[in-house]
Amino acid sequence: RFLQYVAFDTQSDPNSDTYPSTAKQLILLNHLLEEMLRMGLEEVEIDAHGYVTGTIPASTGCEKVPTIGFISHVDTSPDMSGTHIHPRIIESYNGEDIRLNDDLVMKVSDFPELEHFKGHRLIVTDGTTLLGADDKAGIAEIMTAAAYLMDHPEIEHGKIRIGFTPDEEIGRGVEFFDVEKFGADFAYTMDGGFEGELEYENFNAASAKISVQGRNIHPGYAKDKMINAIEVLHDLHALLPATQRPEHTEGYEGFYH
C-alpha cells in the first residue's frame, strides 16, 4: 500500500487560495474513498473540502465502547518535489551510510537514528524527490489495520472512525474539519516518530508574511534617500532573540524561525 500511495503526487501549495490547495490531492483522497468502499467500511464520504471519512462499525456487544478515530494527511511538503518518486528498498540495512545517488549520501553521523534500524528493511528515495512517508506511511498503517479488522470480525472493538485530510504541511489541515461530525471520543494522528512513541500534546505555530517596499535611487544621489529593503529586513531579523531559534531550543521552549 505504501508504495502505491507514494506514487501519487500530492504536494500542497502555500500560495494557493483554494481548498485543498492543489487539485492533485483529491486524486489520492478519492482513491482512498474507493478503497474504503471496497473494504466494506460504512459512512464513507468525501465532503466539499476534500476530507475523506469512514467507519468500521463496532463489534456486536461493543456498541457502547468509546469511539476511536485515526487520522492522517495526504499532502506532502511543498519544499521538495513529489513528482516521479523512485522508492528503493534496502532489504536488510547494514547500519552504514546510505548512498541515495552519486551526489547525495545519508550519513549515520548526520542521522544517528539510523543506528536503531540495523537489520531492518528500509525504504528510501533516489535523493531527487521526497519519499512522501510524511504522511503516506500513516495512511498505509491505517488502511492496512482497517483491512485486517474488516477481514477478522472475531476481533472485538468499538466503533472506529477514519479520516484523511489535505493541506497539513501548509498549516491548513483542519481549517474546515468538522470535529463534531467526525464523532470520535478520542482520536490519534498517525504521523509521528519512532515506533512505540505516543505524543499526547501538539505543536502550535503561527506565520506572518512581511513585505518591505524599498526606495531605489541612483547611488550617486542616494544619501538620506535610498531605502534598501533587504537591509530593513535584516535589521528586523536582528531584533528577534538570538537564543530563541530552533537550533537553541527544545521541549516547551518557543522559537522564531
Where are these regions (language model features)?
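N-terminal capping segment at the start of a domain
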Residues: R1-A23, V124
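Midchain, well-structured core segments that form catalytic/ion-binding scaffolds
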Residues: I98, V105, L114, H120-A133, ...
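Buried hydrophobic packing segments
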Residues: L32, E141-L149, L233-H237
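Beta-rich nucleic-acid/ligand-interaction surfaces
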Residues: Y51-T55, K159-F176
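Catalytic-loop motifs flanking and including active-site residues across diverse enzymes
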Residues: L28, D134-E141, A229-V232
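Short, conserved acidic/polar surface loops in the N-terminal third of protein domains
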Residues: I56, D79-H84, G173-V174
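Active-site metal-coordination/substrate-binding segment of hydrolases
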Residues: E63-K159, F164
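A non-catalytic alpha/beta surface segment that caps or lines the substrate-entry region
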Residues: D17-V65, G69-I71, D75
